[in-house]
Amino acid sequence: MATSRTFIFSNLFIFFLVIATTYGQAPAPGPSGPTNITAILEKAGQFTLFIRLLKSTQASDQINTQLNSSSSNGLTVFAPTDNAFNSLKSGTLNSLSDQQKVQLVQFHVLPTLITMPQFQTVSNPLRTQAGDGQNGKFPLNITSSGNQVNITTGVVSATVANSVYSDKQLAVYQVDQVLLPLAMFGSSVAPAPAPEKGGSVSKGSASGGDDGGDSTDSSDAERTGFGFGIRITTVAAIAASSSLWI
């Protein structure tokens, strides 16, 4: 009997000890920290140059703030690979002002979350954080056929290679070209205007040349007339001298 009671009390002691230990433990760690665009790209790899641009323009901080805001509608980011940046003409980025670099990054960000299937039903041009495409400065058009999504900007055409990351707030897609907006790069790809026939391209210089030509011609005329007068005077003097001898 005593042995049975001892066994029961021992079990009760162990039971309460386990409960006390369980409730006394620190809570399990919560989910990972807030969404961080650069951390996502670093984990994916091959986006070093885009990450550098995000950080130098502080666009990464703005994106992270928007993603973790309760009023956010989500974001869509088109991330060019390092190969895409390396294929740019030398000095392309260095020729941009700080404000233009910010706009270039913003042109790669849509202010809403768009999943891959939704690309088939979007209305063009899409609005980016750089501005409204309706004004013709930052147009971004999407065409989708099956699993292939193509992007055109009026300057370059790019293809969405794959989905890098997606959740309820953010979608990141890998693109094979840097998306160059028309507002900043349109003139660099537009063909040079062909010269008009008849030399009308240099009308301004031609009119200027006419003025210059008139003054030159009049000077020549003056010089020619002056020389002609000297020759006449000389001939007359010789004739007069001859008549005296005769």
Swiss-Prot record:
Expressed in which tissues: Expressed in the sclerenchyma cells of inflorescence stems and siliques.
Positions annotated as glycosylated: 36, 68, 141, 150
SMART domains xref list:
FAS1
Record's keyword annotation contains Ribosomal protein:
no
Q: Where in the cell is it found?
A: Cell membrane
Ordered alphabetically, the record's keywords are:
Cell membrane, Glycoprotein, GPI-anchor, Lipoprotein, Membrane, Proteoglycan, Signal
Query: Among the entry's GO cellular component annotations, what is one?
Result: side of membrane
**A UniProt-annotated Pfam family:** Fasciclin
Protein's GO biological process:
plant-type secondary cell wall biogenesis
Membrane topology per the record? Lipid-anchor; GPI-anchor
Among InterPro entries, the record links this protein to: FAS1_dom_sf, FAS1_domain, FLA_A
Mark the transmembrane ranges: none
Q: Which family does it belong to?
A: Belongs to the fasciclin-like AGP family.
Free-text function comment from the UniProt entry: May be a cell surface adhesion protein.
According to UniProt, the name of this protein is Fasciclin-like arabinogalactan protein 11
